[in-house]
Curated annotation (Swiss-Prot):
One of its GO terms (biological process) is reductive pentose-phosphate cycle. Residues 1-54 form a transit peptide. There are four genes coding for RBS in Arabidopsis thaliana. Coiled coil: none annotated. Keywords: Calvin cycle, Carbon dioxide fixation, Chloroplast, Membrane, Phosphoprotein, Photorespiration, Photosynthesis, Plastid, Transit peptide. GO terms for cellular component: apoplast; chloroplast; chloroplast envelope; chloroplast membrane; chloroplast stroma; chloroplast thylakoid membrane; cytosolic ribosome; mitochondrion. RuBisCO catalyzes two reactions: the carboxylation of D-ribulose 1,5-bisphosphate, the primary event in carbon dioxide fixation, as well as the oxidative fragmentation of the pentose substrate. Both reactions occur simultaneously and in competition at the same active site. Although the small subunit is not catalytic it is essential for maximal activity. This is Ribulose bisphosphate carboxylase small subunit 1A, chloroplastic. It is found in: Plastid, Chloroplast membrane; Plastid, Chloroplast stroma. Heterohexadecamer of 8 large and 8 small subunits. It is a peripheral membrane protein.
Length: 180
């Protein structure tokens, strides 16, 4: 009874289709390639320039906290901050000022894996500056935040509201009590 329930389509074998691609025949003969090579023992012509590179010292990781973009540079002056803010405004990003009272850097207090409580999410100072066209407006907000929270880390971020991503972030102010 069960055999009569099967459709006839399952019983018919279909013929194998011809392939449009030629089968792989292995590697080509080495006769097409030049057999002799010039022995090159000159170390200065190696592409990595390994013989001429001097060792460079890396950024010392002990006692130096890494923050955001440009954190390896000395603190930015007001004119340098204004240039950075002008850059993010030219790119049509929305400036936003954020602050952090305790840790101005990524830290892992509640585990080893990244998550919400690892120092990447700061408190927003007021609202993002939608429609901002002048870096002086943003720097004025940074100064107000400094007056309100003199012991806070303050950063400026550039938010792209079209792609809904943060495009740039840099420290605008470190508290005087910070030694790192």
């Amino acid at each position: 009874m069960a055999s009569s329930m099967l459709s006839s389509a399952t019983m018919v074998a279909s013929p194998a289709q011809a392939t449009m691609v030629a089968p792989f025949n292995g590697l080509k003969s080495s006769a097409a390639f030049p057999a002799t090579r010039k022995a090159n023992n000159d170390i200065t012509s190696i592409t990595s320039n390994g013989g001429r590179v001097n060792c460079m010292q890396v950024w010392p990781p002990i006692g130096k906290k890494k923050f955001e973009t440009l954190s390896y540079l000395p603190d930015l002056t007001d004119s340098e901050l204004a240039k950075e803010v002008d850059y993010l405004i030219r790119n049509k990003w929305i400036p936003c000022v954020e602050f952090e009272l305790e840790h101005g850097f990524v830290y892992r207090e509640h585990g080893n894996s990244p998550g919400y409580y690892d120092g990447r999410y700061w408190t927003m100072w007021k609202l993002p500056l939608f429609g901002c066209t002048d870096s002086a407006q943003v720097l004025k907000e940074v100064e107000e935040c400094k007056k309100e929270y003199p012991n806070a880390f303050i950063r400026i971020i550039g938010f792209d509201n079209t792609r809904q991503v943060q495009c740039i972030s840099f420290i605008a102010y470190k508290p005087p009590s910070f030694t790192g």
